[in-house]
Amino acid sequence: MRIVTATALVMALVGGAAPAAVAQQPTAADGIWRMDGYGTVLSIRNGTLQEYQTTSVSCLRGDSARRTGPGTYTTPDGTVLTVRTQGGRDRGSIRADGSVGDRNLHRIQKLPDPCTRPVPEDPLAAFDVFWQSFEENYPFFSAKGIDWHAVRDRYRPKVHVETTRDELFAVFSEMVKPLYDSHVAVQDGARVFAQGRPGTVPPTAELDAKVKKFIVERDLEDARNLQDFANGRITYADLSGGQGYLRISGFGGYAGAGAPYAAQLTELDRALDTVLSQERIQRLKGLIIDLRINGGGSDALGIRIAERLTDIPYVAYSKRARNDPADPTRHTRPQPAYVTPAQAPRYTGPIAVLTGGSTVSAGETFTQALMDRPGRTIRIGQPTQGVFSDVMSRKLPNGMSAWLPNEEFLTGSGRTFDGTGIPPHLTEPVFTKEEFDKKRDSALDRALRVLRNHGGATS
């Protein structure tokens, strides 16, 4: 089973070779399990974990994983899933490396009946599964003012047995377009429809390279100790006024494409050990963390960085998922994600976090993880993109796929920032055409003034 962490969708569409299986013996986890939320049933037997994606009108086989160690199963794309039974044998949990939190499991006696019957593959069947997948899992229709039932009534009459694949792809794309949710996508092979919040720009590799070159030439010309880490995804420099500049363009890809989470974590720790060395944090007067072009990745890697920025434990956020197909107001129990001070040198001084509309997904959960950080933390720039959830991959009977969020990330007061994004304390333009043309970086300049003049207080 693939549990897609909060990341750019294009990264999630790449698979890999299946891992080798170890000798298989029955385990306490063998059997059939229903997952709280997520519309998922799991079958575990003979060393194979098989996902079934369910709605009230369908059951389709999803991804599978092979047992590769005690309680661990590895998917074809290299994600390690850890399955545990809890208390008696009828409750359990599953966790994907790189994700934050567990998903609860309840043992059931057998697969639901629809999982044992052939699934029609005609366009109408695909439409019904597509619509129902959003109806039962998408949390934000009300907040976005979308009547999903009216959407069905408008578009279902356009679909019939002779509807072509191109026509159906266009229908699905039109249906989800008004959501303006960059964690929503329609996939048909290499063809993908996805879009972000209006007025924002996706954090592509090309934009990342352009911005990095701009910052190095404009802002870091006189910097010391300029260094790239983690396959170029992290950059650090000491600035002339005693501040540090830390640029993070994603929370993944640190050890190269396809590398397992453990390798990503090793590369991140290696970077942090250099950037936040004991000698440096003793003289650092302020730290700028630049997330303005950040395509997301692993929430857990963001928590790992936050653990190097505090001496006091605190809750980063709590995470919950829709848990009733018929009632969008019912959720799983909120599961807190904790920031625990790392057993390594830690920087606890003032921080300025730079964000914008190209701060996406795990870039946003990391921003949220710093909101209640003890000490002075200020956000400067523009609101983030407004997508936080892990991404559900839903297969359709005709071979297409739908991608959608079903989770909310809550602050201590129960607030979410889906749709609107996390707002800055201080608003500045971020990489507009005028900023590029005039070689200005207003957000970074504001961060320097705040840190140098006020030690992190707003101005």
Show which residues each predicted segment covers.
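Soluble periplasmic/extracytoplasmic beta-strand elements of cell-envelope proteins
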Residues: G244-S249, G286-R292, P350-L354, A369, ...
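Flexible, low-complexity junctional segments that flank or bridge functional domains
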Residues: I3, A23-L287, L291-A321, V391, ...
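Short, well-structured beta-strand/strand-turn elements
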Residues: V184, V360, P374-V387
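Low-complexity, Gly/Ser/Thr/Pro-rich intrinsically disordered linker/tail segments
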Residues: D418, I422-S459
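Secretory targeting and sorting signals
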Residues: M1-Q24
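Gly/Ser/Thr-rich loop/hinge elements
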Residues: G296-L354, S358, S389-S393, N406-L410, ...
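C-terminal soluble interaction/assembly domains
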Residues: G381-P397, A402, G419-H425
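Cysteine-centered nucleophilic/redox motifs
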Residues: M175, I351, T359-R373
